[in-house]
Structures are given as C-alpha cells and as structure tokens.
C-alpha cells in the first residue's frame, strides 16, 4: 500500500503518523480516486485469508500510472499494512520520478518484492520499507508491519476491527457513495469482473443440467430482449444471444454477482463468439419490432364452441421451432407464445395465417419479450441509484431500458468491488450481513427500523450473543448497506454496532425471485377491517396480541402496525417465506375471508438515511 509523507518531515520517524497526507497535502488518508480515464481495478494476487480486497484507486493527475498494489490489505486508524509474502506491481508511464534510498531505481519495478533488500524504516513503529516514490515533494512509501504486531481484529468476528470499523471497506465504500460518476469507458480486458464492456452479444453458460429446458433457462433472464437460445446437452452448456450488447452485459454481470444456480448447479459464466444479427431478424426488428413472443388475438370468435388449448397451440406451432412457453388469457381471448429465437417467431407471424386456415381471421403479431420486463427488484435498485424519491419507483418502468441497464451495471460494479474487497472473491454474491455488539436489550423491531437500502429475505437475532444476521433479497443491496454502514456507522439505541459479512447466503432461490418480482415481501397487508364493529365484540379479533397469535403460526412476527383511520394493519415477518405462506393460508380463517389480503412494502427497502 502506498501512503504519502511530506518530504520536509520524512526524517522525523517519531512523528510519521502525524505526517500522513495524500497527493494534495490534505488530511485525507486515502489517495484521491481516479477519473474515468485513469481508473484501474486490480484483483489481489493471493487467494488465502479472509482479508483479501480489490483496491481501486489512483491519482487523477498521474495519467496511466498506478500505485496501489495487489495483495491482502488492512486499514488501521493511523497506517496501512500489507500481509507478508504478497506480490505487488508498479506500472510506470514515465511520469513518476522513481527514487530509491536503499537500492537502485531498477529494483523498484519488479513484480515480487525482494525481502533481502528491505530495511528498517522505523524501529519505534515496527515499519519496514518496501519501496519509495518521490513526486511533487511528497514521498510515497510501501511498507508492512513486522509479524510480531498484535492483531487489531476482533476475535469473535475477523471481518471487523476491534473498534467496530471494517478494515477494507473504506475505499470501496467511497466508490459506492460516488457511484453516480460514470464508469470507465475502457475496462481492463483481463478483469473477470468487468461490468463495463461486452465483447459479444452472446453469453456462455457452462455446467448446465443435461435436461435443461429453454423455459427453465430463460426464467433466470431479466436483462433485455433475447434473440436466440441454444442448449447443447451433451456438452452441458448453453448460449443466450441478445439483440444488443448492453443486455448481454447486464445478464452476464447479474449472473456472476448473484452466482447463478440452476438445478442445484453453479453455472459457469463466460462470453460466446461475437456474431452479427441475422439480416432478416435485424430488418424485422427495425420495421415491426419483432421479438420471440408471438401474440395471437381474437381467439374467441362468435360461433366457436371453445377456446384454443395450450396443447393444440403446441401442435400447430412446434413445426416452426422450439417453444419456450405459452400463456393463454381466456377472458380476453388472447395468447402469447414465446419461441427459442426471434427468427422462429418471424416465421410464425409470416406463414401461420397462410398455411393454417384456422388462423386466417386471427390477429397475429409480436408481443413483448418476457426477458425484457423490468422486475420490482430492478426498479427498486435503479430508483435508489438514480435518486428517485420514495414511492416513485414505478416510474422507472417507463424509462429507457438502456438507461436503466447502465444504472444497474454501475451498481453491480460497485457491489462486486465491495463484496470482494472485504471478503475475498468467494464473497461475491453474498447477501448476508453480520451485525455485532448489539445492545443487550435490543429487539428485532429496532434493528429493522435501522436497516435501510434493500428488501430483506430474512433477519435472525441471536439474543444470547448480541448479534444479528440480515439477509437481503439482492446482493447489490447487501453490499451497499455494508459499505454505507461501515462508512457512516450503524447505530441501534445510540450504540455503534459492528458490521461484517455473514456466512455466504448462496443464490436467491428462483421461486422466491419470481415471487418478489410479483410484489412479494415480508410485510402482509390486511385491509377493509371494521375496527368499530370489532370493538363491539365480546372478544376483539384485531388486537396486536391476538393478531400476533394468529399469524405467528406461519412464522416469527417482527412487528404489527395498525392504521385505524385507513381500516388496515400490517404484519411484518422476519422471513419473506413466512409472509408468502401466511398470505396463502390466512384466507381459510373465517375472520379474514372477506378482507383484502396482499403484500405491503418492506420498510427496510426505503432509501438509506445517509443518501436522503
């Protein structure tokens, strides 16, 4: 790690901690973050230990020169340290005037440090110099603490320092809080977490189940219009081609960040060979807005005895190509048939009315690709990132798809940096955040009142250990909450709590993801309650104690809120699965059969206090 010491004071080893500054000679401990042209992201070279990080930094005015190093870094209150035996790398474009007091300048640009050349920097502080850079009267030292230094980490939770501050989050937290800045145009080509450019419209998926269907695969795609899907069972791989690279990039980054899992298999994500869109497909997209989805209207015509069944549609249409899914809306007399490719759908729209007399009087055209619908979670994430006011998230749905994709990609890039910087590469996609040193009398309701920034899947409080594990629906929300809590602190009952990463949550189950996209949350809304009539009963039903007793049979209840003036109440569960179960079962209770039951809004998904 590189820190700056004022050149006029570098001989005073006893006052080194007082002389730490950045390139601009202010009191900020961090080097300034780079502009988009100078941005550089480096992955750590070591794969061991829980403190690995990706450190993104570099001075704005130094061109392509990069001075933060690879390796395991720990941020202490007054200095930087680096774990021993890790490699580092300097990149010199001729701007830096490299000087070395101990050795020759040529030794400065080696990829692996030479331990025999290290010399004592300060006996009092137990520092050892690795390298030194001089620029604009500032000296930049890379150094490490000796191995006999006492560990500053909490024994119970190695992800947080003893003072409650996460050691590696500060730089990446700054990246998140400044996430509105544009991402770099040219990304590192060899960076596996490249969220900024796509080499192809086609995403490769490896280790897929041999019996995987097109529908099962595309149930996981929510990033844009799909041109074509190919599954190769004998090679256990698949290729999903989109009509544009931005949609491919969003799916690629989302699959990596969320650790795409299909059929209990961890899916390998990569890029397919770059290809051009078929000229026929491109022309029909341009003129007719062609998609994989074929719309058939006027399915119920006067004189016809019955609707067209899904089985009959499959028989009539399977000759045109593999079918993804079929949806029939009988009351409207319409059907939507998704094919595996746009070309197959074009063949149906062009030839079906001609080749099959039954469809001559039907309305046949293109519908919207189901993979291009913006989910509730995407709306929520994009709204927070774009600073949309609470309650206006639905307006995101009407925004330009590419605009939303860019916002989600920038969020994904920041989330990946946060997750890997603090917990290593294996922490990518983790949705569980650890909260420690909680007040002894804390209630789970108080924690939920303090957690903001994302919908929750579950929250678990261990009262005997004064710790809590919060699992978000989306890993992006978890990473942002972790960063903001580490940067600004997380307090409950005016006590600052420790923040770290919990055990990896794994990917969100697809069934739960679909439920969330349809509005599911851990909050159950009960409306049309007659509180006046209930008060006249000998035993009231709609009291907090009675409702808690009724709803507790489906899972732990976190909070119950009453709004008598609106004739409703809200029951918040600690787990979203319990809320889904309650919504499904509560109608069997005679007191609730005539009431309006739906999902409410999870208050933990509100905008974080720091960003309001």
From Swiss-Prot:
Record keywords, A-Z: Cytoplasm, Repeat, RNA-binding, Translation regulation
GO cellular component, one term: P-body
Compositionally biased tracts (Low complexity): 1-28
Presence of the UniProt keyword Repeat in the record: yes
Alphabetized InterPro entries for the sequence: Cwc2/Slt11, Mrn1_RRM1, Nucleotide-bd_a/b_plait_sf, RBD_domain_sf, RRM_dom
Pfam families in alphabetical order: RRM_1
Biological process, per Gene Ontology: 3'-UTR-mediated mRNA destabilization; cellular response to cell wall damage; chromatin remodeling; mRNA splicing, via spliceosome; regulation of translation
Keyword RNA-binding carried by entry: yes
Region (Disordered): 1-57, 105-125
RRM domain boundaries: 201-274, 292-379, 431-504, 522-602
Bias (Polar residues) ranges: 42-57, 115-125
CDD domains: RRM1_MRN1, RRM2_MRN1, RRM3_MRN1
Subcellular location: Cytoplasm
Main location: cytoplasm
Miscellaneous remark of the record: Present with 7950 molecules/cell in log phase SD medium.
Function: RNA-binding protein that binds specific categories of mRNAs, including those that contain upstream open reading frames (uORFs) and internal ribosome entry sites (IRES). Probably involved in translational regulation.
Protein name as annotated: RNA-binding protein MRN1
Organism: Saccharomyces cerevisiae (strain ATCC 204508 / S288c)
Record lineage: Eukaryota, Fungi, Dikarya, Ascomycota, Saccharomycotina
